[in-house]
């Protein structure tokens, strides 16, 4: 079973409009509300793929209750309740544009953060792989993910970590390393303080920087150009076919689902990389975020090429 961790989930609200009118009333007929957050996208895709998954994280208030109730009933859930209220994230879809209004979310009390570590530690006993995704809520220290990784390391559970900015920097500078990280070029540039291109020779050099020492897998998305990956001392390039992209949001989370599944099933490097890329591509072909149509899985799988470089 895979444990997904979403520390800052949200209720994702979609307001479709023909036109967004400023400084007046806009009436919405078809409102969509879903349980949101990067980790919950991972959860949905794993469930649709057929893997056993347990979802955890922090929820609070009536919105937190709504969120838990609106996670697929087939998914096991064990969230930790806090005093603060789970946030709303609003997307206004008008014409070909999307305007987002994102609430900051709750401020987590210090004791709540400590108590969740104990909650997490107990959940580790019943899972084989951990996937940690998304931002940290206010109130938690920037190195909080390093604490989760430390507990998972102590329990012998591999960790797929998908975060960015200061939270990722803190983990990389910690002695406690995740098994997998999946930065994109922009995030690599931010971490290193210099521009990083998609040139394969440059990426090889970058992924051997001291900052990334101790990370078993580093998987870098190159968008339509596929993926570059480092596993131990071996480098890979994944070539992908061109597809019709409907909604790319959530494709990174679907990729995390594939990586986590590959670790769970102890697949070969090539199998893990292909699965991860296929799930990311399947998500991009769907209107709904964090959703894959498994009927198209094998056709895409057969088109991907993994090369050692």
UniProtKB/Swiss-Prot annotation:
An example Gene Ontology CC term for this record: cytosol
> Which reaction does this chain catalyze?
D-tagatofuranose 6-phosphate + ATP = D-tagatofuranose 1,6-bisphosphate + ADP + H(+)
GO MF terms on file? ATP binding; phosphofructokinase activity; tagatose-6-phosphate kinase activity
This enzyme's EC code(s)? 2.7.1.144
Q: Which GO biological process categories is it annotated with?
A: D-tagatose 6-phosphate catabolic process; lactose catabolic process via tagatose-6-phosphate
Pathway it belongs to?
A: Carbohydrate metabolism; D-tagatose 6-phosphate degradation; D-glyceraldehyde 3-phosphate and glycerone phosphate from D-tagatose 6-phosphate: step 1/2
Gene3D superfamilies hit by this protein: 3.40.1190.20
Which keywords appear in this protein's UniProt record, sorted alphabetically? ATP-binding, Kinase, Lactose metabolism, Nucleotide-binding, Transferase
Tell me any Pfam family this protein matches: PfkB
Query: Which family does the entry's similarity section mention?
Result: Belongs to the carbohydrate kinase PfkB family. LacC subfamily.
Q: What is this protein called?
A: Tagatose-6-phosphate kinase
Could you tell me the gene encoding this protein? lacC
């Amino acid at each position: 079973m895979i444990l997904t961790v979403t520390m800052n989930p949200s209720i994702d609200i979609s307001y479709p409009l023909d036109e967004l009118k400023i400084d007046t009333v806009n009436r919405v007929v078809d409102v969509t509300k879903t349980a949101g957050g990067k980790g919950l996208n991972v959860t949905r895709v794993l469930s649709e793929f057929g893997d056993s998954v347990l979802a955890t994280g922090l929820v609070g208030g009536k919105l937190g209750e709504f969120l838990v109730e609106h996670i697929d009933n087939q998914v096991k859930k064990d969230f930790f309740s806090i005093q603060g209220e789970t946030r709303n994230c609003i997307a206004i879809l008008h014409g070909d544009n999307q305007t987002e209004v994102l609430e900051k979310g709750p401020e987590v009390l210090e004791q709540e953060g400590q108590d969740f570590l104990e909650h997490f530690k107990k959940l580790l006993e019943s899972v084989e792989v951990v996937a940690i995704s998304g931002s940290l809520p206010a109130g938690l220290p920037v190195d909080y993910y390093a604490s989760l990784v430390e507990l998972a390391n102590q329990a012998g559970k591999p960790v797929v970590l998908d975060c960015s900015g200061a939270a990722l920097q803190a983990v990389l500078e910690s002695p406690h390393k995740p098994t997998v990280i999946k930065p994109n070029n922009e995030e690599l540039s931010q971490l290193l303080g210099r521009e990083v291109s998609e040139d394969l020779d440059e990426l090889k050099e970058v992924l051997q920087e001291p900052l990334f020492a101790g990370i078993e897998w580093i998987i870098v998305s190159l968008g339509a150009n596929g993926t570059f990956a480092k596993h131990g001392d071996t480098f890979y390039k994944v070539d992908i076919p061109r597809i019709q992209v409907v909604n790319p949001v959530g494709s990174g989370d679907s990729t995390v689902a594939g990586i986590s599944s590959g670790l769970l099933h102890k697949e070969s490097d090539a199998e893990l990389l292909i699965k991860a890329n296929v799930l990311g591509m399947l998500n991009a072909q769907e209107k709904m975020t964090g959703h894959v149509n498994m009927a198209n899985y094998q056709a895409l799988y057969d088109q991907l090429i993994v090369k050692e470089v």
